[in-house]
Amino acid sequence: EEIAEELLDDVMKEDTWDIHDNLSFPLPVIIICEILGIPIDDIHKFKRWADATVEQMCSEDPQQFEKELSHMRDYLLDLILKKRKHNEDNTLLSRIAHSKINSNYLSDDEAVNLTVQIFVAGNETTTSLISNLVWRLMTIDNLWEDFVNDKIDINNAINESLRYDPPLLGLFKTTSKEVNIEGNIIP
């Protein structure tokens, strides 16, 4: 709430502003960076990396995003290795860095991949949710007025927005071992 209020305080000083660029984009990135314990100084870098990750999944030429993704992975690995050298702190990244399975740390790839997934999943979906919800509230008669006058429950508005304008239209999953589902083998 505090971060959203700070962002809104900044934009209220402007004559015009963009909901996506000034609120929907930075809010989830800042929050995720704070939860993970990643410095937010490079917020635009992280947004670019997150966008590249999503675009790569849908691209006919996924290799075009490899340079950006390599920079992100290197940056995150460096942070994870630094966290492993120091005592565990209260950040999620520290907990990932110090996580063990059978007395062994997660591999570097596992720790980086988990961090990327957390960052991308929380960022893209929340950015889209905020933008879609505000757009709907402002384009349907009287909804914005009802919303600002507390005639619309925020939780119901969010749930309806997720149902009507979902930020994600598909999920990609990979199995860790071969699975048989109703006679269909999934490698």
Positions of predicted regions on the chain:
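Cytochrome P450
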Residues: 1-187
